[in-house]
Each structure stands twice: as structure tokens, then as C-alpha cells.
Regions:
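Hydrophobic/small/kink-forming positions within alpha-helical transmembrane segments
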Residues: 14-17, 21, 49, 70-78, ...
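C-terminal transmembrane-helix exit sites in multi-pass transporters
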Residues: 52-55, 82, 99-121
Length: 197
């Protein structure tokens, strides 16, 4: 029996859990928001573009699905990276992890999936959990911060990305995986001058 799956799972969880550390380091030296997204995902796009070009014949019939993956996944990544760099990490991650709520609702509204009593119960428990964790009574008297809104947008974008990924079933896995990198870089290219960064 091989331990490779367990090692990969633990390694991925550790990398995901500690991914905010370099973001805070970059923020401490003044590289934050869309310029950071442009730098990181611009570099990753250098690897993504050749793969996307090589697989273009396979994804061309579902190019709109791949575009949705790039926009939704790229937007989610850009929003999450910025929120983690400027906000409270725990709060940002809690708001981001409402993504399954948006995913269930999106599956119901966009893909016609059934909302079973079990799913409705899970949605209600998730909303109650976030309300208790974030102290909803104070949230009603204090508006959400910019990083809070970015975290919510990231969760919503991630859910829409997952729905688009499921719908674009003929797009090769490598293209589905790499398109959000290019999407993040392009979103940052547009938003850097708009935001004056």
C-alpha cells in the first residue's frame, strides 16, 4: 500500500493553510492587491498559455465554458488573494468558506439540481454557524469591511467556477485548471489602472 495519496493530501492542506503567510509578507513590503495578483498570476500564466494553446482544439467547442472558468476562477482567486493580504485571515477564510452554500444554491438555480431537505438543513446550519462565528449582532451594527466583501465575492466566484467546471465536461482537465491563472492575471491588468495601483 502506498502512502502517496495521504502525503499529497496533507501537503496540499498544509500549503493551503499556510498560503496566507507570503501574502502578508508581500503586504508588509507594500505589494498588495491587484499588483500582487498581476505579479503572481502573470508569472503562472507564462506556463498556462502554452498548455491552453496546445489543447485549444479540445476545448474550442466549449470555449464559453472555459471563458466562464477563467473569469469566475480568476475573479475568485484575485479577490481571495487581496482579501487575505489586507484582512483578518480567520474572518476572510470563514466568509470564503460559504462557497458550498453558494454552490448548492447555484446548482439549484443554474443546473436544475434538487434542493433536498438534507441540503436545505445543511444550508441553514452553515448560515447559522457563520452568524454565530462572526457575531451577527455586531455585524448588523457595523458594515462589512472591504476584505469581508472580497472574501464573500471570492466564495461566490469559486462556486460559479465549480459550476462552470462541471458544465464544461469536454474541456481537458489541464485547461480547466490553468484557465483561472490567466483569468486572474487579465483581471489584474484591467483593475490595476482602474484602482490606481
Amino acid at each position: 500500500m502506498t502512502l502517496l495519496p495521504q502525503i499529497l493530501l496533507v501537503t496540499g492542506a498544509v500549503a493551503w493553510g499556510l498560503g496566507w503567510l507570503p501574502l502578508h509578507h508581500f503586504a508588509s513590503v507594500g505589494l498588495v492587491g491587484m499588483p500582487l495578483v498581476l505579479l503572481v498570476y502573470g508569472l503562472l500564466s507564462l506556463f498556462a498559455i502554452p498548455v491552453l494553446w496546445f489543447e485549444r482544439r479540445a476545448w474550442m467547442p466549449q470555449r464559453n465554458g472555459l471563458l466562464a472558468i477563467a473569469v469566475c476562477g480568476g475573479g475568485a482567486t484575485a479577490a481571495l488573494v487581496t482579501a487575505l493580504a489586507i484582512g483578518e485571515v480567520v474572518r476572510v477564510m470563514l466568509l470564503f468558506y460559504l462557497a458550498p452554500v453558494w454552490g448548492v444554491l447555484g446548482g439549484w438555480l443554474l443546473l436544475g439540481e434538487r434542493l433536498t431537505p438534507l441540503r436545505i438543513g445543511a444550508l441553514l446550519l452553515a448560515m447559522l454557524g457563520i452568524a454565530l462565528t462572526l457575531n451577527i449582532s455586531s455585524a448588523l451594527t457595523h458594515p462589512l469591511s472591504g476584505s469581508d466583501w472580497l472574501a464573500l465575492a471570492a466564495g461566490l466566484g469559486f462556486s460559479l467556477n465549480n459550476l462552470a467546471t462541471r458544465a464544461a465536461d469536454q474541456v481537458p482537465l489541464a485547461s480547466k485548471t490553468l484557465a483561472p491563472f490567466l483569468g486572474s492575471a487579465l483581471i489584474a491588468v484591467v483593475l490595476c489602472p482602474v484602482l490606481g495601483e
